[in-house]
């Protein structure tokens, strides 16, 4: 089963996915790293200190990689971790964070003020959640505000375990749309 773990930068995707990889031995594709390592991008955006992913190249590369991971007998889950994961997977978990807290997280990373504000605004207007609705069949939402990566990983596990066991009805608390941070837009 391929699951996307997406969200605005700073919501905890990488920390959570690393915990799940260690605890559950689920395979993780850190998409942003893959894009950079395999040059699956069209250009370097110097201003944003990032690359512009070539989604066609990404989509053509992933099936082979995922098939290899799924061949391992004990592996039932592959997690695609990236703020772009919702463009690729049919099932996605969107990690969210209250924008003022998100700003603090991104400032600690040393992001420029412009990049911090751009990401906080994107989170305020539910940008990735809205895109996930457009691209994905199943969307779940987890609030990471004031929570540890371990706590958030527990929620991700619950969602994935429920999906694997066909008990999706147990996931109402993760239904998208419960978080509204529009008031945090400056």
UniProtKB/Swiss-Prot annotation:
Q: Which EC numbers characterise this protein's activity in its record?
A: 2.7.4.3
In terms of superkingdom, the source organism counts as Archaea
The UniProt record gives the binding positions of ATP as: 10, 12-15, 109
Instruction: Kindly indicate whether the keyword S-adenosyl-L-methionine belongs to this entry.
Output: no
Please list the coiled coil stretches.
none
Q: Spell out the residue ranges making up region: LID.
A: 108-118
In terms of Pfam families, this protein maps to: AAA_18 (PF13238)
The record's InterPro entries line, in alphabetical order, gives: Adenyl_kinase_AK6, P-loop_NTPase
GO molecular function annotations of the record: adenylate kinase activity; ATP binding; ATP hydrolysis activity
Keyword check for Transmembrane: no
EC class? transferase
The entry assigns this protein to a family as follows: Belongs to the adenylate kinase family. AK6 subfamily.
Question: What is this protein identified as?
Answer: Putative adenylate kinase
- In its UniProt entry, the species of origin is given as Methanosarcina acetivorans (strain ATCC 35395 / DSM 2834 / JCM 12185 / C2A)
Its lineage opens with: Archaea, Methanobacteriati, Methanobacteriota, Stenosarchaea group, Methanomicrobia
